[in-house]
Amino acid sequence: MKRKALFVMVALGLLSASQAMAQSKIGFHAIGASAAFVSPQDLDGTFGLGVFADLGQIAPNIGLEPTIEFWSKSQDQFGLESSLRDISVGMRGKYYFQVANPKVRPFAGAGLGIHFLHAEATATVPGSGTFTATGDNTKLGLDLGGGISTALNSKNDFRAEAWYGIVSDVNQFAVRVGISHKLAM
């Protein structure tokens, strides 16, 4: 299933690439970093980090953005320590709306990501010792969201965005802020 999902993502990207290249401005236009408040399903909120790149436009007003994001949450209740970690690698498409003020660029987007999940639980039972269980899983996720991007100066942009990630058993809502740095092209 994991290989099939990865194959479908790559195939769709390659099939659409030839048409898109004719009208696109693809290349590394900017790189950036973000910080987030992430609220995973059935867990308290936590802090997340991410990096991203602006690959330009594949069509008028449609930008392409690869992302790598990370968050981790640990809890200790009644002698049971548990933690869940998510590292996601994904690709998002963003539609930039035409507005009267070109300094503020609102967008809505969607994307796919592969989530590498790791869970661990440790319980200490008096007289019996410590028991630990771990589990790893890889899942495909769908991201839906939007936000704004605005120039700080000629080389740097600020962005604020909200994304909802639909990932089996680990849906998550994230509010992110980030800075991107434009590369010389």
Language model: regions and residue ranges:
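Cleavable N-terminal export/targeting peptides
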Residues: 1-27, 184-185
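Outer-membrane pore/translocation modules
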Residues: 22-44, 100-102, 114-139, 184
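Glycine- and aromatic-enriched membrane insertion/assembly motifs of diderm outer-membrane
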Residues: 24-98, 149, 153-157
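Outer-membrane beta-barrel pore domains and translocons
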Residues: 34-38, 67-71, 111-115, 163-165, ...
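Outer-membrane beta-barrel translocator domains and adjoining extracellular loop/strand segments
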Residues: 43-49, 75-83, 118-129, 170-176
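Outer-envelope exported proteins of Gram-negative bacteria
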Residues: 65-67, 90-92, 105-111, 159-163, ...
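Outer-membrane beta-barrel "beta-signal"
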Residues: 93, 171-185
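A charged, solvent-exposed segment within the mature domains of Sec-exported extracytoplasmic proteins
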Residues: 127-167, 178
